[in-house]
Amino acid sequence: MLDPNLLRTEPDAVAEKLARRGFKLDVDKLVALEERRKVLQVKTENLQAERNSRSKSIGQAKARGEDIEPLRLEVNKLGEELDAAKNELDALLAEIRDIALTLPNLPDDEVPLGKDDSENVEVSRWGTPRKFDFEIRDHVTLGETLGGLDFASAVKLTGSRFVVMKGQIARLHRALSQFMLDLHTEEHGYSENYVPYLVNHDTLYGTGQLPKFAGDLFHTRPLEEEADSSNYALIPTAEVPLTNLVRDEIIDEESLPIKMTAHTPCFRSEAGSYGRDTRGLIRMHQFDKVEMVQVVRPEDSMQALEEMTGHAEKVLQLLGLPYRKVLLCSGDMGFGARKTYDLEVWLPAQDTYREISSCSNMWDFQARRMQARCRSKSDKKTRLVHTLNGSGLAVGRTLVAVLENYQQADGRIEIPEVLRPYMKGLEFIG
């Protein structure tokens, strides 16, 4: 959520930055609501002061033996007016908050202006795409031929955009996630976490999935029903539970940064992607991901973004997968992000780079929603932390990249060297 003080004092500047993201802020409405809030705030405070004064007068009049009934009636009337003013102010504040919850984060000044992914800026490339002297097969053909990817059974069990993995392909999928976790915990300084796959609405508000993206989630009960302790949603990413671990906390600055990782399934309705990537593992309702989250001091967050992106890059480098690093333009960034890098891995069968990791600095956007703060020993004042998240990596898409980049002419798949210890020394599948 954006800083309410910024919305109050610099609405035009906020509107200009939001316009870079293609979002139109109704400044006139916001200014009118703010003016009304000021009036109601003063009215409420004046009524409260007047009521307190009159209440005090009752005691004084009673001590003098005077008739207190007129004063008592006046105090009761003031109380009714005060309650009405408070209710009106609360309703207005709720309206302002509802507007604030729909506003995306402001883009950093370094973010290039653009409408969509066609205007993202390539930062660098690593590795050289392999040249094949045989006809390239895509991951679906490779996986089905090897008996390791069974989409037909998944359709029978559930529906489209699901898969059953079997045998050595399933084992390779597991090996990838174990390799990623080991790398991040043993070399990159993250602590491993096991988190719930179902979360409540407060958690989803904290990281920004609600209220705007309710339709992208799988809910245990209709969202229209009143939220209670049994109203959950499946996590779209481990970012949600991991980041919310610091919700409503005041953290000693000396303990920052906090670096967390988790391997979880992720569940997404893909409501806005009808007809896109219908073949294979690229866009699934259920997929695994190893997530990285950092909670840092505000002054450290941009450097932390570079570090985190480097951690995701290291996975690809050790796997020997060619990729490119892209800085997202203002129109392509996620709702809560201030600055984002995407890593796109080379997929030979598609003859293009496809997203495999997204690393974002969320600034204080999530922290303000979660009321996650930090405090130094030398200063009693608290301040909002900054939060970051990144894929390290999407396991299914990494499997796709390994299958396609390491395929052999005879249909076998070579196992990348770093994965062989997780596969009991196996060098090839098939």
Curated annotation (Swiss-Prot):
<dbReference type="InterPro" id="IPR002314">
    <property type="entry name" value="aa-tRNA-synt_IIb"/>
</dbReference>
<feature type="binding site">
    <location>
        <begin position="355"/>
        <end position="358"/>
    </location>
    <ligand>
        <name>ATP</name>
    </ligand>
</feature>
<keyword id="KW-0648">Protein biosynthesis</keyword>
<keyword id="KW-0436">Ligase</keyword>
<keyword id="KW-0067">ATP-binding</keyword>
<feature type="binding site">
    <location>
        <position position="391"/>
    </location>
    <ligand>
        <name>L-serine</name>
    </ligand>
</feature>
<dbReference type="GO" id="GO:0006434">
    <property type="term" value="P:seryl-tRNA aminoacylation"/>
</dbReference>
<dbReference type="Pfam" id="PF00587">
    <property type="entry name" value="tRNA-synt_2b"/>
</dbReference>
<dbReference type="InterPro" id="IPR042103">
    <property type="entry name" value="SerRS_1_N_sf"/>
</dbReference>
<comment type="pathway">
    <text>Aminoacyl-tRNA biosynthesis; selenocysteinyl-tRNA(Sec) biosynthesis; L-seryl-tRNA(Sec) from L-serine and tRNA(Sec): step 1/1.</text>
</comment>
<dbReference type="InterPro" id="IPR045864">
    <property type="entry name" value="aa-tRNA-synth_II/BPL/LPL"/>
</dbReference>
<dbReference type="InterPro" id="IPR010978">
    <property type="entry name" value="tRNA-bd_arm"/>
</dbReference>
<comment type="subunit">
    <text>Homodimer. The tRNA molecule binds across the dimer.</text>
</comment>
<dbReference type="InterPro" id="IPR006195">
    <property type="entry name" value="aa-tRNA-synth_II"/>
</dbReference>
<dbReference type="GO" id="GO:0005524">
    <property type="term" value="F:ATP binding"/>
</dbReference>
<dbReference type="GO" id="GO:0004828">
    <property type="term" value="F:serine-tRNA ligase activity"/>
</dbReference>
<feature type="binding site">
    <location>
        <position position="291"/>
    </location>
    <ligand>
        <name>L-serine</name>
    </ligand>
</feature>
<dbReference type="InterPro" id="IPR033729">
    <property type="entry name" value="SerRS_core"/>
</dbReference>
<keyword id="KW-0547">Nucleotide-binding</keyword>
<protein>
    <recommendedName>
        <fullName>Serine--tRNA ligase</fullName>
        <ecNumber>6.1.1.11</ecNumber>
    </recommendedName>
</protein>
<dbReference type="GO" id="GO:0005737">
    <property type="term" value="C:cytoplasm"/>
</dbReference>
<keyword id="KW-0030">Aminoacyl-tRNA synthetase</keyword>
<keyword id="KW-0963">Cytoplasm</keyword>
<dbReference type="InterPro" id="IPR015866">
    <property type="entry name" value="Ser-tRNA-synth_1_N"/>
</dbReference>
<feature type="binding site">
    <location>
        <begin position="268"/>
        <end position="270"/>
    </location>
    <ligand>
        <name>ATP</name>
    </ligand>
</feature>
<comment type="similarity">
    <text>Belongs to the class-II aminoacyl-tRNA synthetase family. Type-1 seryl-tRNA synthetase subfamily.</text>
</comment>
<comment type="function">
    <text>Catalyzes the attachment of serine to tRNA(Ser). Is also able to aminoacylate tRNA(Sec) with serine, to form the misacylated tRNA L-seryl-tRNA(Sec), which will be further converted into selenocysteinyl-tRNA(Sec).</text>
</comment>
<dbReference type="Pfam" id="PF02403">
    <property type="entry name" value="Seryl_tRNA_N"/>
</dbReference>
<dbReference type="GO" id="GO:0016260">
    <property type="term" value="P:selenocysteine biosynthetic process"/>
</dbReference>
<dbReference type="InterPro" id="IPR002317">
    <property type="entry name" value="Ser-tRNA-ligase_type_1"/>
</dbReference>
<feature type="binding site">
    <location>
        <begin position="237"/>
        <end position="239"/>
    </location>
    <ligand>
        <name>L-serine</name>
    </ligand>
</feature>
